Amino acid sequence: MLPALYIFLIAVCILPTLPGLIGVIMAALGYMPALGLHHFSMQGFAQVFQWQGIGHSLGLTFFITLLSTYLACFFTFAILQSSWGTRWWRRIETALNPLLAIPHVAFAIGFAFLFAPTGMGMRALYALIDPTFNATSDTPLLIQDPYGLGLILVLALKETPFLLLMSISVLKQLNVKQTEQVAASLGYNRNQIWLKCVFPQWLSKLRFAIFAVIAYGVSVVDVAQIVGPTNPPTFAVLVWQWFNDPDLQLMPRAAAGAIVLFALGSLLLAVAFSIEWILTKGINQWLWSGRKAFRLPGKSVFVLLISLTALIIPLLTLWSVALRWRFPDLLPSRYSERFWQLEWSNILSTINVSVTIALISASIALVFAIVAHEYRIKYRWHIPNYIIAIPMLVPQLSLLFGLQVLTLYTNIHHYGVWVTWAHLFFVFPYVYLALDGVYRSYDQRLTQIGLSLGKSPLHVWLKIKLPQIASALLFAWVIGISVSLAQYLPTLMLGAGRISTLTTEAVALASGSDRRITAIYALCQALLPLCFFVFAYTINKKKAPTTEQVRSTHHELSYQ
């Protein structure tokens, strides 16, 4: 049974990667029989590099991705250095769930409402300085600025909680407490210990998570459309615009752009690996020469992160009920629930679609993740983690076009099924990795004891293992739901524009619709995954089974 499920998992979540890449390569080379293109050519690539401003767009994407990734790494390490093992860290761990729950799109819309030239930040500045003070400027500072500074800040702030989450298992493996004790006995203080002893190991073991952040940053479209530069846009947005060109004869250009985006992402991964090698092995004199170290403002960084995130919900709520809000008034002069009443029926149907797809894809992904981990434990041959994580490490546009072509060849027009499958394809790696730590830390001797009592593997799993990992399973399921709710490109491309979710509606409205309607959809998109995290937190408040409970379970099994 387990091998059959594992093969089915491979067929659904891993093998489609190959036709996805092959499909986009064939289209980039000009071979698309459905469009009457039967000959291979490099015209698509020529059209890409002939596009005016292509060099600027590529350079901008490279700069934004690299800077946002390492700014997030700096924020993460600063928070860890100042708080790991202290009371502060307990508060940070508690706050990680709501921070992770806020989707990128909702955060970006709230960020735009806060830092736009007529946003809450400028309104507060007017109120503090002088209501008659005139400091408005047509030059954007953080929202759609030409250098992408706002996009860098949004990506860095949103990826910091993810890197913190990934760092927990890394630091537990490193046994930081013992390292601190040994180094302290040699006369090093906490700052020196973390910089010279912990940082090199932490950076190396966090490589995979950093690669995932880079892959997301280089291919992000939804957030870049909201706060990113527009003339030229980032390269992923440019490729997305090419995919939406009504002239289908130009489709090879879009496919070639997706290949170039994949190459750019690969280059960034190589640069990240080189930076890691230089810091830890190449130019490593700083690790042992002298005792200079400095305290990073980790607590201040976390306060900034939690403050910005906490401002988003009330700000979106305020905009959703604002009937009249002139600039530079700090608060609306008139309030009304009119826009909620007008949009409520549409919102309910959109929420229904979003939640249905998220529940189905996350539940199947959870089952697949359990199957994959159980198979890895029982059998020597299994798919390596880096292959399972390919959807996380490859730009989405570089895969989705090929997957879209694959669905067209099947001649099945059930778009809801294809969208759910696309969500499952991208949700599964996150759920699998969320369970990786708990499966590796689980004591297999407990299972062996149960099997030695003559019980079936399924009976032992349900009675012994499941109670031990139930909290992690629930948390991984909720992560899968939040990842599904945040999917933008898979919904649009595999749904052919016929499936609307909160994310697709919020991005579409953020590009120029009424701020009040935009705020309503962004608020719903922010609160929905938060509700699931609150649900998981409430369930997990029940204590995990203690050692005595496990022993009593073994005793009970032995007499059944």
Identify the residue ranges that each predicted region occupies.
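Glycine-rich helix-loop "coupling/hinge" segments at transmembrane-helix boundaries
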Residues: 34, 38, 222-249, 328-333, ...
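Short amphipathic alpha-helical coupling elements at transmembrane boundaries
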Residues: 43, 47, 93, 127-130, ...
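Membrane-interface capping segments at transmembrane-helix boundaries
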Residues: 174-177, 273-282, 442-445, 535-549
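Helix-loop-helix hairpin linking two adjacent transmembrane segments in secondary transporters
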Residues: 247-259
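Flexible interhelical linker loops that connect adjacent transmembrane helices
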Residues: 275-301
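Membrane-water interface segments at the C-terminal ends of transmembrane alpha-helices
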Residues: 2-33, 46-172, 205-222, 228, ...
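Short, highly charged, low-complexity non-transmembrane loops/tails of multi-pass membrane proteins
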Residues: 184-186, 286-288, 451-453, 547-558
